[in-house]
Design a protein with these regions (language model features):
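N-terminal catalytic or cofactor-binding beta/alpha core of small enzyme domains
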Residues: 1-120, 124, 130-133, 142-153, ...
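A short, acidic, flexible beta-alpha connecting loop/helix-capping segment that sits on the rim
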Residues: 135-137
């Protein structure tokens, strides 16, 4: 099992709601083509909307990087002007714990519960980072909005930075 997990979460049938899955699919495609080099110790997983079913997937990892759509109230940001569609926000598991009653997204509370359960079962996860992308639309459809699609390269760069921050480098 790879010690670093990149987990895309979301429902690809609801446009921007599926951004996490779209990004993991993009990274997987690029890695297969050789245009994206990842360390051997990194696993890319499409988590869909599985929630607590991901317990075994995240258990025992040194670092878990979750990519998901997030909705954050503008007043919760130091700079509300930067919270528009396509904005990328970084959260930690500790941030989720402090906001466990807040509704960051449809998945973040489930993620918090899954992480808590992993700890209770002795399957602790090391560092958890959530890269959240603010959606423009959650309408039915398969394509990302232009604003969210434009954020994809930035999110991939941030994922790569998170990977190298723990000392893992492409082989």
């Amino acid at each position: 099992m790879a010690s670093i997990l990149v987990l895309g979460i979301g429902n690809i049938l609801l446009r921007d709601e599926g951004v996490g899955v779209h990004i993991v699919q993009e990274m997987t495609d690029r890695a297969a083509k050789g245009t994206l080099k990842l360390p051997d110790d990194v696993e890319l997983v499409d988590g869909g909307t599985f929630g607590i079913d991901l317990l075994d997937t995240i258990a025992g990892r040194r670092k878990v990087i979750v990519i998901d759509a997030v909705q954050v109230a503008a007043e919760e940001s130091a700079d509300p002007s930067k919270i528009g569609p396509g904005a990328v926000l970084r959260f930690t598991a500790e941030d989720l714990a402090q906001r466990q009653t807040a509704d960051l997204s449809l998945h973040q509370i489930g993620l918090f519960e899954t992480l808590s359960m992993a700890r209770q079962l002795g399957s602790a996860v090391g560092e958890v980072v959530i890269l959240g992308i603010v959606p423009k639309t959650l309408e039915s459809g398969l394509e990302l909005s232009p604003e969210v699609a434009a954020a994809v390269p930035k999110v991939i760069d941030l994922v790569l930075k998170e990977i190298t921050d723990v000392g893992a480098y492409p082989g």
